[in-house]
Amino acid sequence: MEGIFTFFGVISENHTFLFVSHMFLAALLTLIVAKLATKRLQVVPTGCQNVMEAYLEGVVAMGRDVIGESYAKKYLPLVATLGLFIFFANLMEIIPGFEPPSGNINFTLALALIVFIYYNFEGIRKNGVIHYFAHFAGPVKLLAPLMFPIEIVSHISRIISLSFRLFGNIKGDDLFVWVLLMLAPWIVPLPGFALMTFSAFLQTFIFMILTYVYLAGAVLLHEESL
């Protein structure tokens, strides 16, 4: 937002520069945490390794009920990396002097496209092109001309759903606290910061669980048809 101080804004106030800088910072933090967690692996984990193992076990447990144990572990690298990246991007809205890249539609749209392309790729790879797209037509052949375009629109709408949900919530929280700071810059904004912290966790979780849900719908066609 224009007029708000950011550390990167000292270098340049160009909006694109600020967005890209904060995005790379979120990516760098993700890499640093991953590096610290795997630097000295121990049988009995301590420190950052302990936190990371707990996080990864939580991600697998989250995916287990959606897609099964084996697939939850298979897609763990994608979902866990997205989770860390999005979380650090969201967290920047809480820290003064930083601007959350997830409050930019370009960021969230890019992530949504990654998920969309990947789950369709996995669905085609697992089931074959014909079988995968035949599933869009539904079980009743007579209704296939109606169901196929509806399913196509439904899948494309997932891009909008994923991207605008994350963007809207983070941007909305940002604007909400900004208004509170303008009205009363001391005690009043504190509940707003608590809300932003909760939202950072919640929106990360929602994006991760939906990624697992979309992957399950793409690769488990055989189970759905039973």
Curated annotation (Swiss-Prot):
<dbReference type="GO" id="GO:0005886">
    <property type="term" value="C:plasma membrane"/>
</dbReference>
<comment type="function">
    <text>Key component of the proton channel; it plays a direct role in the translocation of protons across the membrane.</text>
</comment>
<keyword id="KW-0138">CF(0)</keyword>
<keyword id="KW-0472">Membrane</keyword>
<dbReference type="InterPro" id="IPR035908">
    <property type="entry name" value="F0_ATP_A_sf"/>
</dbReference>
<dbReference type="GO" id="GO:0045259">
    <property type="term" value="C:proton-transporting ATP synthase complex"/>
</dbReference>
<keyword id="KW-0375">Hydrogen ion transport</keyword>
<feature type="transmembrane region" description="Helical">
    <location>
        <begin position="17"/>
        <end position="37"/>
    </location>
</feature>
<comment type="subunit">
    <text>F-type ATPases have 2 components, CF(1) - the catalytic core - and CF(0) - the membrane proton channel. CF(1) has five subunits: alpha(3), beta(3), gamma(1), delta(1), epsilon(1). CF(0) has three main subunits: a(1), b(2) and c(9-12). The alpha and beta chains form an alternating ring which encloses part of the gamma chain. CF(1) is attached to CF(0) by a central stalk formed by the gamma and epsilon chains, while a peripheral stalk is formed by the delta and b chains.</text>
</comment>
<feature type="transmembrane region" description="Helical">
    <location>
        <begin position="201"/>
        <end position="221"/>
    </location>
</feature>
<dbReference type="InterPro" id="IPR045082">
    <property type="entry name" value="ATP_syn_F0_a_bact/chloroplast"/>
</dbReference>
<keyword id="KW-1003">Cell membrane</keyword>
<feature type="transmembrane region" description="Helical">
    <location>
        <begin position="78"/>
        <end position="98"/>
    </location>
</feature>
<comment type="similarity">
    <text>Belongs to the ATPase A chain family.</text>
</comment>
<feature type="transmembrane region" description="Helical">
    <location>
        <begin position="175"/>
        <end position="195"/>
    </location>
</feature>
<keyword id="KW-0066">ATP synthesis</keyword>
<keyword id="KW-0813">Transport</keyword>
<dbReference type="InterPro" id="IPR023011">
    <property type="entry name" value="ATP_synth_F0_asu_AS"/>
</dbReference>
<dbReference type="InterPro" id="IPR000568">
    <property type="entry name" value="ATP_synth_F0_asu"/>
</dbReference>
<keyword id="KW-0997">Cell inner membrane</keyword>
<protein>
    <recommendedName>
        <fullName>ATP synthase subunit a</fullName>
    </recommendedName>
</protein>
<dbReference type="GO" id="GO:0042777">
    <property type="term" value="P:proton motive force-driven plasma membrane ATP synthesis"/>
</dbReference>
<keyword id="KW-1133">Transmembrane helix</keyword>
<keyword id="KW-0406">Ion transport</keyword>
<dbReference type="Pfam" id="PF00119">
    <property type="entry name" value="ATP-synt_A"/>
</dbReference>
<dbReference type="GO" id="GO:0046933">
    <property type="term" value="F:proton-transporting ATP synthase activity, rotational mechanism"/>
</dbReference>
<feature type="transmembrane region" description="Helical">
    <location>
        <begin position="104"/>
        <end position="124"/>
    </location>
</feature>
<keyword id="KW-0812">Transmembrane</keyword>
